[in-house]
């Protein structure tokens, strides 16, 4: 009748206000979700998108957090959760003809990676 209160041991890393559209970052995140740490590194190294480098650094940071804070080895972790959330827009104006201003919206996003040890 009692519930098992085992807490998952997970390491997390997040990048906030990353200057990229959420859809462009999701295109990369969807490829690595549920994969092991080593598979994700190999995939990100050879994908041709600009978001890959930042996500590669984020995965390395999550693995370092797992190693340092939780004592997990770098051999077994896998990406249990990877999400991209939209953030605020940087709003700018581009000067146009006859004194008008044309709005420029520069999107940002929050990227969160959660890793757990595969048993």
Swiss-Prot record:
GO molecular function per UniProt: rRNA binding; structural constituent of ribosome
Top-rank taxon, per record: Eukaryota
PROSITE patterns listed in its UniProt record: RIBOSOMAL_L22 (PS00464)
One of the protein's GO biological processes: translation
Compartments reported by the entry: Plastid, Chloroplast
GO CC terms, sorted: chloroplast; large ribosomal subunit
UniProt keywords, alphabetically: Chloroplast, Plastid, Ribonucleoprotein, Ribosomal protein, RNA-binding, rRNA-binding
Subunit structure, interactors included: Part of the 50S ribosomal subunit.
Function in brief: This protein binds specifically to 23S rRNA. The globular domain of the protein is located near the polypeptide exit tunnel on the outside of the subunit, while an extended beta-hairpin is found that lines the wall of the exit tunnel in the center of the 70S ribosome.
PANTHER family, sorted: CHLOROPLAST 50S RIBOSOMAL PROTEIN L22-RELATED (PTHR13501), LARGE RIBOSOMAL SUBUNIT PROTEIN UL22M (PTHR13501:SF10)
HAMAP family attached to this UniProt entry: Ribosomal_uL22_B (MF_01331_B)
Similarity annotation: Belongs to the universal ribosomal protein uL22 family.
Protein's recorded name: Large ribosomal subunit protein uL22c
